Amino acid sequence: MPDVPSTLSHDWAFAVFLLGVCGLIAFMLGVSSLLGSKAWGRSKNEPFESGMLPTGNARLRLSAKFYLVAMLFVIFDVEALFLFAWAVSVRESGWVGLVGATVFITILFAGLVYESAIGALDWAPEGRRKRQAKLKQ
C-alpha cells in the first residue's frame, strides 16, 4: 500500500497542473478579448469569399455514400492501429498473438467481402442492382 504523503504529493501536483491549464486558458481568452477588434457591422458577420458577395446557402447535401466511405475509413484505420500495436509486440506475443491477429484480420476481411457482395461499396447504381438481382436468385 503506498504511503499517504507520496499519494497526496501526486494529487497536489495534478491539481497545480489543472490550475495552471485553467489559468493559461483564461489568460489567452482575456488577452484576445482585450486586444481583438471590436468593430461590429453587417460586413463583419458575412464570410469572406475573395471579395465577392456570397450567393446562396453554403450548406450542401452530400450523398450517403460519402458517409459510408468515411465510416469504412475509420473502421480500417482502427484496424491498422491494432495491427501496428501487434506488429510492435510480435515477438512478445508469440503464437497466441499471431493466431489472434489472424482471427482479427479474417473477421474484418469477411466484413469487407460481405459489404462488397451486397453492393455497399458500389458507387454506380447499376452495379448494385445487378448484384442484388443475383443475390435474390
Swiss-Prot record:
It is a multi-pass membrane protein. NDH-1 shuttles electrons from NADH, via FMN and iron-sulfur (Fe-S) centers, to quinones in the respiratory chain. The immediate electron acceptor for the enzyme in this species is believed to be ubiquinone. Couples the redox reaction to proton translocation (for every two electrons transferred, four hydrogen ions are translocated across the cytoplasmic membrane), and thus conserves the redox energy in a proton gradient. GO terms for cellular component: NADH dehydrogenase complex; plasma membrane. Disulfide bonds: none annotated. It comes from Ectopseudomonas mendocina (strain ymp) (Pseudomonas mendocina). Belongs to the complex I subunit 3 family. Keywords: Cell inner membrane, Cell membrane, Membrane, NAD, Quinone, Translocase, Transmembrane, Transmembrane helix, Transport, Ubiquinone. It holds the Pfam family Oxidored_q4. NDH-1 is composed of 13 different subunits. Subunits NuoA, H, J, K, L, M, N constitute the membrane sector of the complex. GO terms for molecular function: NADH dehydrogenase (ubiquinone) activity; NADH:ubiquinone reductase (non-electrogenic) activity; quinone binding. The chain crosses the membrane at residues 12-32, 68-88, 94-114. This is NADH-quinone oxidoreductase subunit A. The keyword Transferase does not apply. PANTHER family: NADH-QUINONE OXIDOREDUCTASE SUBUNIT A (PTHR11058:SF21), NADH-UBIQUINONE OXIDOREDUCTASE CHAIN 3 (PTHR11058). Its EC number is 7.1.1.-. It is found in: Cell inner membrane. It catalyses: a quinone + NADH + 5 H(+)(in) = a quinol + NAD(+) + 4 H(+)(out).
